Amino acid sequence: SVSRGLGDVYKRQKYTKENIIKYLKNPETNAKQLRNASIYLYEVSSQYRRVVNYFAHMCPLNYIMYPFKFDATKEINDKAFKASYKKATDFMSIFNLRHEMRKALTIAWREDIFAGYIYQTKDSFYIRKLPADYVKIASIVDGCYIVAFDFSYFRGKEDELESYGQEFIDKYEIYKKDSSQRWQLLDEKKQFCLKISEDVTYPLIPLAGCLVGIYDIEDYKDLQKGASILRNYKALGLKLPTDETGNLLIDKTLADQFYAQLTNITPDNIGVFETPMDVQVFDFEKSGAEDPDKTYEAIRNFYNDVGVSSLLFGSDKQTAASLNISITADECLTFAVNRQIERNVNRLLKNLSGTQKFQITILDISEYHRQQFHDLLLKDAQYGVPVKSAIAASVGIDQPAMNAMLFMENDFLKMHEKMIPLSSSYTLASGDEAGRPTAEENGEEISDSNENTREHDSNASR
């Protein structure tokens, strides 16, 4: 077991390697213990934290917005349509999707479930994480998970009630009058819940399979450290001469004086001893070819347990093609979670007043393939595919920002009139004359042959 370094911290927190193995044998029963272990390891293990953040931060969450259940065959009330669109873009502006979801995704990839309660004013929006031990998934509405809250949480914590809001105050009063009302559903319009492991009903840590590997890394670090100390340790044996009967041939006091002198000049990693016997050396060090870096191997195995390429985190040797395939497989996992985010946001957008509802789609872009996706959209645009909003979104300009920037640049600042590019082959109109400057323009005389060429337009057919 781990005996030094992080191992001491693990033991103090009662999360040993043996505990994790035991929890994994029955993850449903031990869901709480696995979640708490995952939270703690996220804080103390750089490898685990990087893997969680790798999945949580992979997608920039760029999105486009368009009408929901739009019927182009019916006459559109332009004023009502614009009013509904304005409400939707205003909502997405205060939502701040990328920031709120970055926090939510980090928690979800670490704990499997993120359950939050929405606090919204006219100009602000915030999703508060609910304590994981006091929420459970109770139903599904419009494809979104809906949770119930355990109001026994506030027993002895009544001072926190006001910060949670009126719904919690009212339902806690219900619980105090009737203890059977411990679990109560929260207003579905104020909930936001994500679950990474959608294939199981109970909380299952998405990266649970690699938790044991964290301890293996620490074990091998300790072994490597011990081996390194051993390789650098030397011992000097002072053999005292003896006669055939074993009696010392020199005075022991004199031998001790030489021993003391030697110990005073030797460094800490060199030991000195006296012996009347021959000393035989036993070397436990293996050759470099036979002694692979076990710590490196443990780190590589850790990433293999997760299912991601260790090359992403500075180890292992793979080809660019295999790395790209590995990232693509990881992207598929994160894109699936994006669909949950879409459904939650669209459920909230449906609650807005207005004759026309709007919805969003999060583009399947990752930080690793952003440029390829952007180039693909530009090619699609050449064939008339309506991707202008997607092109803007792919570079981080979402719909509310795009509307504002179009007005600022074109109508207010009139940049298209004031920012005049230098003349070049890209900016000249097709009717402009091309070719090098004429002889007259260069201040030179025209030769007879050039004059004849101009008169007969001999270069026209070239």
What are these regions (language model features)?
Residues 98-115, 253-261, 283-390:
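C-terminal amphipathic alpha-helical
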Residues 1-10:
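Single conserved hydrophobic/aromatic residue that forms the stacking wall/gate
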Residues 256-261, 265-266, 325-329, 333, ...:
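C-terminal anchoring/interaction modules
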